[in-house]
């Protein structure tokens, strides 16, 4: 086994059976890989949906809470202005913007102004930022695609460099080995006898 491939070998009684086993194994691995890939993709897909939903809900909750606080501050300021008899705003009241911003001195703005602001705050719909609508569109599109995740069928996670096939004539490695050994012996034996005969003749002459 190397970094990018796994080599598997097996033997079978017939070439046809070997091809059948190979096909079944490849289909099994293909389906397993497809299931794993699909599962991982779904997890990432659903995680993205959750992130978008959370982002959208956070924007809605924050703006709703801001509007609620604004209405409460204006209502309280209006009640104080009514009790204090402050009908109209006087520019002589030198109140800084920072004091008005925290709601403590809003009553200085007087009853008429506060009532108008309160009516606007209650009746005006929440204005959402651009990223809210971008998030909403993404959610809409992804939700339409979600139903199609279950429609993945007949997908192959592999392709053949060449189609698998089996030989017409069955391979016989034992027969080939025997023939090779016989060929080698056929060459060596005559050579051995020739050398042996030569040695015997030489010994006779010397005697």
Curated annotation (Swiss-Prot):
Subcellular location field: Membrane
Alphabetized InterPro entries for the sequence: Bact_polysacc_biosynth/exp
One GO cellular component, as annotated: membrane
UniProt organism field: Haemophilus influenzae (strain ATCC 51907 / DSM 11121 / KW20 / Rd)
Superkingdom in the source lineage: Bacteria
Principal localisation: membrane
Protein name (Swiss-Prot/TrEMBL): Uncharacterized protein HI_0866
Keywords: Membrane, Transmembrane, Transmembrane helix
Topology with respect to the bilayer: Single-pass membrane protein
Transmembrane stretches, start-end: 177-197
């Amino acid at each position: 086994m190397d970094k990018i491939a796994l080599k598997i070998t097996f033997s079978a009684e017939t070439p046809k059976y070997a091809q059948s086993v190979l096909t079944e194994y490849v289909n099994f691995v293909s389906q397993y890989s497809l299931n794993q890939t699909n599962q991982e993709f779904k997890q990432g897909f659903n995680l993205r949906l959750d992130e978008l939903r959370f982002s959208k809900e956070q924007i809605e909750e924050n703006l709703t809470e801001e509007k609620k606080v604004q209405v409460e501050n204006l209502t309280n300021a209006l009640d104080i202005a009514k009790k204090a008899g402050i009908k109209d705003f006087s520019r002589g009241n030198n109140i800084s913007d920072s004091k008005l911003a925290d709601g403590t001195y809003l009553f200085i703005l007087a009853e008429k102004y506060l009532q108008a602001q309160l009516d606007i705050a209650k009746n005006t719909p929440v204005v959402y930022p651009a990223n809210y609508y971008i998030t909403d569109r993404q959610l809409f599109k992804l939700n339409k695609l979600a139903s199609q995740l279950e429609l993945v069928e007949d997908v192959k996670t592999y392709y053949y460099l060449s189609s698998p096939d089996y030989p017409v004539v069955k391979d016989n490695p034992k027969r080939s080995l025997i023939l090779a050994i016989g060929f080698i012996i056929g060459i060596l034996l005559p050579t051995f006898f020739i050398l042996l005969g030569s040695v015997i003749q030489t010994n006779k002459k010397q005697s």
